[in-house]
Swiss-Prot record, chain A:
Part of the multisubunit axonemal dynein complex formed at least of two heavy chains and a number of intermediate and light chains. GO terms for cellular component: axonemal dynein complex; axoneme; dynein axonemal particle; motile cilium. Its main location: cytoplasm. This is Dynein axonemal intermediate chain 4. One of its GO terms (biological process) is axonemal dynein complex assembly. It is found in: Cytoplasm, Cytoskeleton, Flagellum axoneme; Cytoplasm, Cytoskeleton, Cilium axoneme; Dynein axonemal particle. The gene is dnai4. WD repeats lie at residues 477-517, 526-573, 586-629, 633-673, 676-715, 721-760. Disruption phenotype: Morpholino knockdown results in ciliopathy-related phenotypes, such as curved bodies, hydrocephalus, abnormal otolith, randomized left-right asymmetry, and pronephric cysts, accompanied with paralyzed pronephric cilia. It comes from the Eukaryota. Keywords: Cell projection, Cilium, Cytoplasm, Cytoskeleton, Flagellum, Repeat, WD repeat. Plays a critical role in the assembly of axonemal dynein complex. Plays a key role in ciliary motility. Pfam families: WD40 (PF00400).
Length: 778, 117
């Protein structure tokens, strides 16, 4: 049947073009393989292969002829179904397949579908299939008229169409390829075809049921019932076919205007600390802020992003900020109220700031910082740090060079003056004593008071800090001149002050209050004469009451007293200094004034006392009747006696008889005596770093003696300005600096240069010196 | 006879709070200003208005505004790293001067020093 217009082509190449007849045994095939893709709505993926005896033509295999196809069934009859409507001449017709010849009923129902489907599927079909050729296909579909169909079938048809159209496209694609290959028909080319997995793009369950399925009967019955129903209801008003049309009235333009929508730009910078603050402030939020936390967060950063401080109530400009915040939080309304009131009160604001404690602290800090800049090289020298030159300061460098050159040239020891502690408060006062704080080595307490009865004026205690050499940190005004000072070691803030009138007061240096913690004025046993020295001693007595530190004082009334203070001070006499020498016997009292004392560094029970008659007595605190030993060498009052920190047997004493004596506690006569000029020696001190070095201040000069170098002459003499007498000497325990207090109220800090500590054990060095001296004497 | 007890600190110490505090503050400000190389000191209140200054008004206002912003930024940086931390002091060393700022919530204490004089 070559003349049949069924030019279905098999997919396989072996099939000749002309001789192709579709093998349709039962008439089931795919007639619509035209490029314009006729939809066979009756075919769905499932139902296609369900016909039993029909030979199923593979969707893909059938080729679409360019011209209209004719369907011929097995009997050779032309059963080409007539199209329901004739499309435009320019558009190729699509055929409807008469698949189930036996199913007339179903066909009739079915045939109504496709047209609708054509119309409705255009949109949906163009969706997934964007190929251009298919676009033309959909156009043809649209042009077909639609009939009203029930909704449910419409949808199904849509999906059916999709599945059909897939095959259409595929077949169309195959066609050009096949035509090319026919030229090589003779050569056998092996073409391996494989089928991909079925891609279900759309799956609509079939509404058409195969005749041979089990449900066919039920479906048929339902269909029949429906048609019956339609027939019965012909005249029924409820079953009338109706169509509606909406009128589109003439359009009218109407204008509406609304208030301008104010657009506000809001920016919030979310920072870690901001979140932390808000989180912590939620608990602190008062009744004012009824707002949620988000709003609370919003108000705080926005005021800060405006560049103002967090206190918006003080800021006039922030008023505008608050007003534009449309989120009316409780806090913002509160702030608005506050802001209205405050601009009138500018003055108290100022006062508040100026009186705040924080400002004072900041001012103190600022002062120290400024001074640190000024004194930086000096402080660095003090602390034995390398002096860093400021790269921006050219002038200073030049000064430094000249300075250091001088020091480099000389190898002999000299005192390099660093700075001095002085201020207008202290000008003109005599420095009587200086003491370092036990806990903070930067804190220095200086007592100002006269040592003679000439000018009784009020005394002053200044606590200087190394960080501020221009103004003392604490100033305590005392009623009479200060003659003795000592810091407590256990309570580092307690400063004991001994005065010229015999009063002993204990101050707390933490505060700047002028009143002492306790005062000995109430005590019955108070000293009646100047207190020349005070020491805190760590008492290790067995009694619990005596444990801890006690204060011991020596005074010109001849008593060494131990002070205990609970609520008020009470004293117990440790020793009464009885006169030994008849020459000195006084008629007023039987006691000789004590000038100085020193407890043994290792044994806190043994102490030395220097008296006005020139004797030095060794006493024990547990034995207050008799001296243990007496050392007599000085002719005049002994101003200072001090144990050597390195050698426990050796002590040094100085007196107004122009001499300094070095003693060993087992020898009654001094081992060595030092004198340089006929000058009263006011103060001596062992160097805490070197056993053979000690310093002495006498009228007009400061001497540093080094026994290794010479015992006849001081190693270093530093003359003070004329008219000024150095009256106190203090070594710095941390560094190699010496502090000298003078009679004009200045405390000068010197750095000891070129005095080496020396190797070997310090004590041995000193003892060697002593031994050599002793041996040379005998 | 004077009666002293351990609790003397609570009374008698600050007899005239306002005046003595003010005097102390003024004294300290004067001392800072008198130090070697100090060009000026400014105390700025919370609004950015200088309340105590030794420089002329325009310079003071300029310093106050600029340093306030910088201090805010510095404080933000410090607290971002650790919210429990707080900025206590800020020093800016430039070729000619050193600017030192002690910030607080309510005020700003600024000192400008030329250390090389």
């Amino acid at each position: 049947m070559s003349n049949t217009t069924v030019t279905q082509k098999r997919r396989t190449l072996k099939v000749a073009k002309s001789s192709k007849t579709l093998n349709v045994s039962s008439g089931v095939f795919r007639p619509n393989q035209s490029t314009t893709k006729s939809i066979n709505p009756l075919f769905s993926g499932k139902s296609f292969g369900s016909t039993g005896d029909s030979k199923v033509v593979d969707k893909i295999s059938a080729q679409t002829p360019k011209h209209t196809a004719m369907v011929v069934d097995e009997n050779g009859q032309d059963v080409t179904p007539h199209p329901l409507y004739n499309p435009d001449p320019g558009v190729l017709q699509s055929k409807q397949g008469k698949v189930f010849t036996a199913l007339d009923t179903s066909l009739t129902t079915m045939t109504e579908f496709p047209s609708i489907a054509f119309q409705t599927t255009n949109a949906s079909l163009t969706g997934p299939f964007t190929r251009s050729f298919f676009g033309s296909a959909s156009a043809s579909r649209i042009s077909q008229t639609a009939e009203s169909v029930t909704d449910e079938t419409k949808d199904l048809l849509v999906k059916q169409d999709l599945s059909n159209s897939i095959s259409d496209i595929q077949s169309h694609r195959e066609e050009p390829k096949e035509q090319l290959r026919e030229n090589i028909l003779d050569s056998t080319a092996n073409c391996y075809l494989s089928e991909t997995e079925t891609i279900w793009l759309l799956d609509i369950p079939a509404v058409s049921v195969s005749v041979e399925s089990e449900d066919a009967e039920a479906v048929k019955e339902r269909n029949n019932a429906y048609t019956e129903l339609c027939k019965n209801r012909q005249g029924n008003d409820k079953y009338v076919e109706r169509s509606m049309q909406t009128f589109s009235d003439a359009s009218k333009t109407k204008e509406v205007q609304c208030d301008s929508i104010t657009m506000v730009d809001k920016a919030v910078m979310c920072t870690v600390w901001d979140m932390y603050d808000s989180f912590n402030n939620i608990s602190d939020v008062s009744a004012n802020t009824v707002v949620s936390s988000e709003r609370h967060e919003a108000t705080i950063p926005e005021s800060s992003s405006e560049g103002h401080l967090v206190h918006p109530k003080r800021s006039n400009q922030s008023l505008s900020v608050v007003s534009t915040v449309s989120t009316v939080s409780g806090s913002s309304t509160h702030i608005e109220k506050m802001a209205c009131v405050l601009p009138l009160d500018e003055e108290p604001d100022l006062q508040l700031i100026l009186q705040s404690d924080k400002l004072k602290q900041d001012l103190a800090l600022m002062e120290r910082v400024v001074l640190a800049n000024v004194f930086q090289p000096k402080l660095a020298a003090y602390r034995q740090l390398p002096i860093i030159e400021d790269p921006d300061c050219v002038q200073m460098v030049m000064e430094e060079e000249s300075w250091t050159e001088q020091s480099k040239n000389s190898h002999c020891p000299f005192l390099e003056r660093l700075w001095d502690f002085s201020c207008e408060l202290t000008m003109g006062r005599n420095v009587s004593c200086m003491v370092w704080n036990k806990k903070n080595p930067d804190l220095l307490a200086v007592g100002y008071g006269q040592v003679e009865f000439k000018n009784p004026n009020s005394g002053l205690v200044c606590c200087w800090s190394l960080k501020n050499p221009t103004w003392p940190d604490r100033v305590f005004h005392c009623e009479s001149g200060v003659t003795a000072l000592d810091f407590s070691a256990s309570n580092a803030n307690q400063l004991a002050v001994g005065m010229y009138d015999g009063t002993i007061a204990i101050y707390n240096v933490q505060t700047s209050e002028q009143t002492p913690i306790t005062d000995s004025s109430d005590c019955a046993n108070l000293h009646t004469s100047p207190v020349w020295q005070l020491t805190w001693i760590d008492h290790e007595d067995g009694l619990a009451a005596d444990k801890g530190e006690i204060l011991v004082s020596v005074s010109s009334d001849g008593r060494i007293s131990k002070w205990i203070h609970y609520k008020s001070m009470e004293c117990v006499d440790l020793m009464k200094l009885k006169i030994h020498d008849l020459q000195w016997k006084r008629h007023i009292s039987s006691l000789t004034p004590g000038m100085c004392f020193d407890f043994h560094p290792n044994d806190s029970k043994i102490y030395l006392v220097g008296t006005e008659e020139g004797h030095i007595h060794k006493c024990s605190s547990s034995y207050n009747e008799q001296y243990l030993e007496s050392y007599k060498a000085h002719k005049r009052p002994v101003y200072k006696v001090t144990w050597s920190p390195f050698c426990s047997d050796v002590f040094l004493s100085c007196s107004s008889d122009w001499t300094i004596q070095l003693w060993r506690q087992d020898l009654q006569i001094p081992v060595m005596g030092f004198t340089s000029g006929q000058r009263v020696v006011f103060d001596i001190m062992w160097s805490p770093h070197c056993a053979t070095v000690f310093g002495a201040v006498s009228e007009g000069k400061v001497e540093i003696w080094d026994l290794r170098v010479s015992s006849l002459d001081p190693t270093l003499v530093n003359w003070t300005s004329p008219g000024v007498n150095p009256t106190a000497l203090l070594f710095s325990p941390e560094t190699d600096c010496v502090l000298v207090g003078d009679s004009e109220g200045q405390v000068t800090v010197y750095k000891l240069k070129n005095i080496t500590a020396g190797g070997g054990s310090q004590g041995e060095t000193l003892e060697d010196v002593i031994q050599s001296t002793l041996s040379s004497q005998h | 006879m004077k009666e002293y007890c351990a609790a003397t600190r609570t009374h008698g110490g600050r007899s005239t709070p306002d005046l003595s505090d003010m005097a102390e503050v003024e004294d300290t400000l004067k001392r800072i200003q008198a130090q070697h190389g100090v060009i000026g000191t400014i105390v700025v209140n919370g609004e950015g208005i200088p309340i105590r200054t030794t420089l002329d008004n325009s310079t003071s206002v300029q310093y106050a505004g600029l340093l306030h912003q910088l201090t805010m930024k510095a404080r933000s940086a410090v607290r971002d790293i650790d919210p429990q931390n707080e900025l206590t002091f800020l020093r800016i060393r430039s070729k000619k001067h050193e600017i030192m700022v002690a910030p607080d919530k309510e005020y700003l204490l600024i000192a400008i020093q030329n250390p090389s004089e």
